[in-house]
């Protein structure tokens, strides 16, 4: 039932609203924002809620206690302000991108004299070029790494050319940077590289390959075979990337196709990125829907929130037509892009098929999400947790009789690994006899030092049994920190040990909760073992390279970066060694003779 007293009071207030363009906000009895809307005519639009008997209007008026408004100069400004306020207040009656603040982007700092490609989480009108948003920060970091390898764009934080280092960094010596800090490349040459990076991020791989092929031919003509070989490797990398992408259009159009999957008050949106006629990427986003949400609202809200940051293509295809707001959205998109943007529904069979394929992708993704939800719900029920355990950390120790001891931390968010939050710990404590408990305690102490910036997870999982659990609890008691929840998972019988219980918990082998815990435990073990092997390999390599005249710490780093293991270095031919940037012909011969001299 609607409270007629409050409704009449609100209506009287709205009668005095201006007939201007702007944004209106409904508040509930506690002062919390429940809905944000925009209007060409504020007075007319907000009064319509009182004359409308739709479920949405009834729901808003039932909850509302107060209404406020902001006047804007244009409808496009109202659209932008509405988006800003939805992100700020996250009202229950608006469509929202879940965890919107967390979505990372690629940022090409074109305002700098020597631009860099970096990860950003906030769009700013600073002259940079933004790409995204992406759903995984790992994808962003992989792209940055690939750009370094192919284009040798700088990655340092020096404010060039005002401040710069005295000598080039390791990236120069391993061939991942042209060292503009040392003037080894002109500004004009560097900006040619930047243009190549833009083409790469725009998906113009064939154009880049053609240019690189011409360069390779030129080097070969001039008998500069080492340089030609490096260009050849870059071409192969780009060809491999291009081959993985599916050709979906032969007109080389740049467009995004958007599809939705709605279930209860949740939805998923999928964006297919098509560049130069190839499907180069798909991005899936989770949306929170209000209790009552129309198709128009869903499409409009997602398009606005998604394209208020990151890149905008020439064409955006949505699954169905929507309201008169389409005109304002187009104006907003054109203004943000700085050129014409077409916002439309599918026009041909090719686009219809792609939207059908997108719907299948979303259905599969929804089934996966359901399995994760079952696992998290089961964990919450079994361990009597107050909230769904959306964040889980896993810990393990790896060593060989106490030597090269390391610890690992892996992080799972909503049932999936988030590798940017993985951490490796080189154990500082070196007892006479190996002691896994003391090593584990050191790792946990170091993790808890950063608890303000890095809050505790919902579940902390330890690879081990009752002894490991007790060792970890000792550290929490010592530091007077209250854990959310800790458990230890022993490998042999998959026994789960928890605080305050002497007997282990045994889950059935088909339990979704057990499968998730095993995944976290095994990933922590894998990560620890890989780091342990890396340290052992480095120590072994260093012990050999120390004996070779002319190979110091810097060259050791270069060789480790190039060959990873001692075995790979031993197998390397003299030509392979000569190709490594920073390794002269003379040093390459010394290294080769050290490993191959049979005399």
UniProtKB/Swiss-Prot annotation:
Entries under SUPFAM superfamilies matching the protein: C-terminal UvrC-binding domain of UvrB (SSF46600), GIY-YIG endonuclease (SSF82771), RuvA domain 2-like (SSF47781)
Q: Which InterPro entries match?
A: GIY-YIG_endonuc (IPR000305), GIY-YIG_endonuc_sf (IPR035901), GIY-YIG_UvrC_Cho (IPR047296), Hlx-hairpin-Hlx_DNA-bd_motif (IPR003583), RuvA_2-like (IPR010994), UVR_dom (IPR001943), UVR_dom_sf (IPR036876), UvrABC_protein_C (IPR050066)
**Which PROSITE patterns does this entry report, sorted A to Z?**
GIY_YIG, UVR, UVRC
Q: Which GO terms describe its cellular component?
A: cytoplasm; excinuclease repair complex
Q: Where in or outside the cell?
A: Cytoplasm
Q: Which domain of life is it from?
A: Bacteria
A biological process (GO) annotation for this entry?
nucleotide-excision repair
Q: Which SMART domains match?
A: GIYc, HhH1
Question: Which keywords appear in this protein's UniProt record, sorted alphabetically?
Answer: Cytoplasm, DNA damage, DNA excision, DNA repair, Excision nuclease, SOS response
Residue ranges of every copy of the UVR domain listed in the record: 206-241
Identify the residues that the record assigns to the GIY-YIG domain, covering every copy.
Answer: 19-95
The free-text function statement in the UniProt record for this protein reads: The UvrABC repair system catalyzes the recognition and processing of DNA lesions. UvrC both incises the 5' and 3' sides of the lesion. The N-terminal half is responsible for the 3' incision and the C-terminal half is responsible for the 5' incision.
Indicate the quaternary assembly: Interacts with UvrB in an incision complex.
Q: What is this protein called?
A: UvrABC system protein C
Q: Specify the species.
A: Dictyoglomus thermophilum (strain ATCC 35947 / DSM 3960 / H-6-12)
* Encoding gene (name): uvrC
């Amino acid at each position: 039932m609607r409270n007629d007293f409050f409704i009449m009071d609100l209506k009287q207030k709205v009668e005095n609203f201006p007939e201007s363009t702007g944004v209106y906000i409904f508040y509930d009895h506690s002062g919390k924002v429940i809905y944000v809307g925009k209007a060409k005519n504020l007075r007319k639009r907000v009064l319509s809620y009182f004359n409308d008997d739709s479920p949405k209007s009834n729901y808003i008026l039932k909850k509302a206690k107060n209404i406020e408004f902001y006047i804007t100069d244009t409808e496009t400004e109202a659209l932008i302000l509405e988006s800003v306020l939805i992100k700020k207040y996250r009202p229950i009656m608006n469509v929202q991108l879940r965890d919107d603040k967390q979505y990372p982007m690629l940022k090409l700092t074109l305002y700098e004299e020597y631009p860099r490609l970096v990860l950003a989480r906030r769009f700013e009108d600073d002259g940079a070029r933004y790409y995204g948003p992406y759903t995984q920060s790992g994808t962003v970091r992989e792209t940055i790494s690939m750009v370094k390898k192919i284009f040798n764009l700088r990655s340092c934080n020096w404010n060039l050319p005002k401040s710069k280092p005295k000598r080039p960094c390791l990236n120069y010596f391993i061939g991942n940077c042209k060292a503009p800090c040392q003037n080894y490349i002109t500004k004009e040459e560097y900006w040619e590289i930047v243009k190549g990076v833009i083409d790469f991020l725009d998906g113009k791989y064939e154009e880049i390959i053609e240019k690189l092929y011409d360069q390779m031919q030129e080097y070969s003509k001039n008998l500069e075979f080492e340089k030609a070989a490096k260009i050849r490797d870059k071409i192969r990398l780009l060809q491999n990337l291009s081959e993985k992408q599916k050709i979906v259009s032969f007109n080389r159009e740049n467009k995004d196709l958007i599809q939705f999957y709605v279930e209860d008050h949740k939805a998923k949106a999928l964006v297919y990125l098509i560049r130069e006629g190839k499907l180069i990427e798909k991005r899936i986003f989770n949306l929170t829907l209000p209790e009552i949400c129309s198709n128009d609202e869903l499409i409009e809200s997602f398009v606005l929130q998604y394209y208020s940051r990151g890149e905008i293509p020439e064409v955006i295809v949505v699954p169905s037509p929507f309201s008169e707001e389409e005109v304002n959205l187009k104006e907003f998109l054109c203004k943000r892009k700085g050129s014409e943007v077409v916002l439309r529904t599918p026009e041909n069979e090719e686009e219809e098929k792609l939207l059908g394929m997108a719907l299948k992708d979303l259905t599969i993704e929804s089934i996966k999400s359901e399995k994760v939800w079952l696992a998290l719900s089961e964990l919450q029920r079994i361990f009597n947790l107050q909230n769904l355990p959306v964040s889980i950390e896993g810990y393990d120790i790896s060593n060989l009789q106490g030597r090269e001891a390391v610890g690992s931390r892996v992080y799972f968010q909503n049932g999936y690994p988030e590798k940017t939050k993985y951490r490796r710990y080189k154990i500082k404590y070196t007892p006479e006899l190996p002691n896994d408990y003391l090593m584990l305690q050191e790792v946990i102490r170091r993790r808890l030092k950063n608890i303000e910036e890095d809050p505790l997870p919902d579940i902390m999982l330890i690879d081990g049994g009752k002894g490991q659990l007790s060792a970890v609890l000792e550290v929490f008691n010592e530091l007077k920190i209250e854990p959310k929840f800790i458990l230890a998972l022993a490998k042999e019988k998959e026994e789960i040990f928890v605080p305050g219980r002497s007997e282990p918990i045994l889950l059935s082998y088909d339990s979704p909760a057990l499968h998730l815990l095993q995944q976290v435990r095994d990933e922590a073990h894998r990560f620890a073992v890989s780091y342990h092997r890396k340290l052992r390999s480095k120590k072994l390599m260093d012990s050999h390279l120390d004996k070779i005249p002319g190979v110091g710490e810097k060259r050791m780093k270069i060789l480790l970066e190039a060959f990873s293991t001692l075995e790979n270095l031993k197998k390397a031919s003299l030509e392979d060694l000569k190709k490594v940037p920073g390794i002269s012909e003379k040093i390459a011969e010394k290294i080769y003779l050290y490993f191959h001299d049979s005399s």
